[in-house]
Design a protein with these regions (language model features):
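Flavin (FAD/FMN)-binding glycine-rich loop and adjacent Rossmann-like elements that form
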Residues: 29-30, 40-45, 49-62, 66-362
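Sec-exported extracytoplasmic/periplasmic mature domains
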Residues: 20, 68, 77-78, 205, ...
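Solvent-exposed, acidic/flexible segments
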Residues: 4-8, 12, 66, 186, ...
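Catalytic cores of secreted or luminal carbohydrate-active enzymes
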Residues: 24, 347, 351-372, 378-396
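Conserved N-terminal/central alpha/beta ligand/cofactor-binding core
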Residues: 1-35, 81, 104-110
């Protein structure tokens, strides 16, 4: 965890610096949404209110819901899922046989700071405190490994001797069924989560002896010094143009829909569900996955226009939401949502009418990933070519489930056989014939095969040595222009009517 942690105040400063560079961007704080403005089936904006009862009405060509729980989906009239999906609907082996309305536990995060040896920052005992609720949070068996208390705290260690308190095992997770409640009723219920985190902080200080760790006084200006909002792991999930499931992630090349070809953000987190605080939740297990991408169609509602969905409210199954919910993923998905909106507005069309490849190209222009390649970084001169060609499926990748940071490999310096290459071309376009040969592909043979596929090359001296996948990707991109062929939201090449 600590590899991706930063102090909230530092993150806020960086985001504000980025936003300040956008001259046409106006940021307004302190308002919450009260309604969605619609004309027929199209969203036209939203109304807001603040704690002073001041109102705000915003009209927009495109409205994006980037809330944790899909707060405006119901207001917008967009169909959505909530809770665990059934095996029948998702075809996922680990999904429950019967759907239910159970969502993951949420957490109200605290930031503790080390005030130095000999200090006592113990807070007042919170109401309803019971040490037994937290017995087993450390020095207990977890997956047959002993977790001592120092390690429990260092799980969320940040710079400047600060600690994020977000601990699932006998920690400050809490189950609250609040998604469908009104704002007022939800806020009342969420007080329980704040109190439970304060109880855990008191336990850390009073029972475990870390009296020098107190609530950070330089992060949040809330009355209790806790975070501004809870960490929701799950909420409403829109029914979208595409529906990402565990199967699409675990085995991307053998699904009815080639959603990997339509990727707009990437992630490497495993399937991770928090349900320890709800005894009624079925155990789904943690099925392994490689790193993955999120398809563009998951951001677009099935039927409602003028509306884009981001964050955890995208069209993904309950099971795979355990991976796509993570903050690095939703940040990238948010970038893609803004890019999608920009492309739609520029072309004066609805999001569902955009060119998948145009959105992806815009993201690539920003050095964003559309394919989750671990071994080809944005600084690589061949990054864009390799991203594009793997997104066509002509050259394949190899996924790997690895600890808490999964991987997908391209192996840019490796060679492939003539058969592997022609199989990829055949899957891209059935007019291309498969050549059954285990001989390593040379530059000369690659050019011959690509010429038959319609590519054009200048007369050059071609090497008879095996060609690397890196150079092959560049060759395909420069000659065949495969990425320029339009695809639909399922990854199929569009046919001209």
């Amino acid at each position: 965890m600590s590899n991706t942690l930063f102090e909230p105040s530092v993150g806020n400063k960086i985001f504000n610096q980025i936003a300040a560079k956008e001259k046409k961007l106006e940021i307004i704080h302190g308002y919450y949404v009260t309604s969605i403005l619609k004309e027929g089936n199209s969203v036209k904006g939203a109304t807001f209110k603040n704690d002073k009862n001041e109102t705000l009405e915003v009209h927009a060509k495109i409205t994006i819901d980037a809330t944790d729980i899909g707060e405006t989906l119901k207001m917008a009239g967009a169909a959505y899922r909530l809770g665990m999906d059934s095996q029948k609907e998702t075809k996922e082996a680990n999904a429950p046989l019967k759907a239910n309305n159970i969502v993951q536990d949420l957490t109200w995060v605290a930031i503790l700071k080390d005030y130095g040896k000999g200090t006592d920052k113990t807070i007042a005992k919170p109401s309803n405190y019971s040490a037994s609720n937290f017995t087993g949070s450390c020095m207990e068996t977890v997956d047959h490994k002993e977790i001592d208390c120092d390690k429990m705290l260092s799980y969320g260690k940040m710079p400047n001797n600060k600690y994020m308190i977000n601990w699932p095992k006998k920690g400050n997770d809490v189950y609250l069924d609040v998604v469908e409640l009104s704002r007022e009723d939800r806020n009342k219920e969420l007080l329980k989560a704040r109190n439970y985190t304060l109880q855990f902080v008191y336990y850390i200080q009073n029972e475990l002896g870390y009296k020098n760790l107190g609530l950070a006084d330089d992060e949040f200006d809330t009355s209790d010094l806790l975070a501004y909002a809870p960490y929701y792991r799950e909420g409403r999930r829109v029914k979208g143009v595409s529906f990402l499931t565990y199967n699409h992630v675990a085995d991307p090349y053998n699904q009815k829909e080639a959603l990997y070809k339509t990727g707009i953000s990437v992630g490497d987190y495993p399937v991770d569900h928090h349900h320890k605080q709800n005894p009624n939740a079925p155990d789904l297990g943690f099925p392994a996955v490689p790193s993955y991408n999120v398809p563009l169609g998951s951001l677009i509602p099935e039927k409602v226009d003028g509306f884009i969905v981001s964050d955890k409210a995208i069209s993904a199954s309950n099971l795979i939401n355990g991976a796509t919910r993570l903050q690095p993923v939703v940040l990238l998905t948010g970038q893609a949502a803004g890019t999608l909106a920009g492309v739609a507005i520029k072309n004066n069309i609805e999001p569902r009418k955009v060119s998948v490849r145009e959105v992806q190209q815009s993201l690539l222009n920003q050095k964003a990933y559309i394919m989750p390649l671990y071994d080809v970084k944005p600084t690589d001169p061949a990054f864009e070519a390799i991203q594009k060609i793997t997104a066509t499926g002509i050259l394949k990748t190899k996924g790997e489930s690895y600890k808490w940071a999964n991987r997908t490999w391209f192996y840019p310096e490796q060679n492939i056989t003539v058969q592997e290459f022609t199989e990829g071309l055949n899957q891209f376009d059935k007019k291309n014939k498969i050549v059954k040969s285990s001989v390593l592909l040379t530059e000369q043979e690659a050019v011959n095969i690509l010429t038959k596929a319609g590519a054009k090359f200048p007369k050059e001296n071609l090497s008879a040595k095996p060609i690397s996948k890196r150079n092959l990707a560049i060759l395909i991109e420069e000659s065949l222009h495969a990425f320029e062929k339009e695809i639909d939201f399922s990854g199929n090449i569009k046919t001209k009517k």
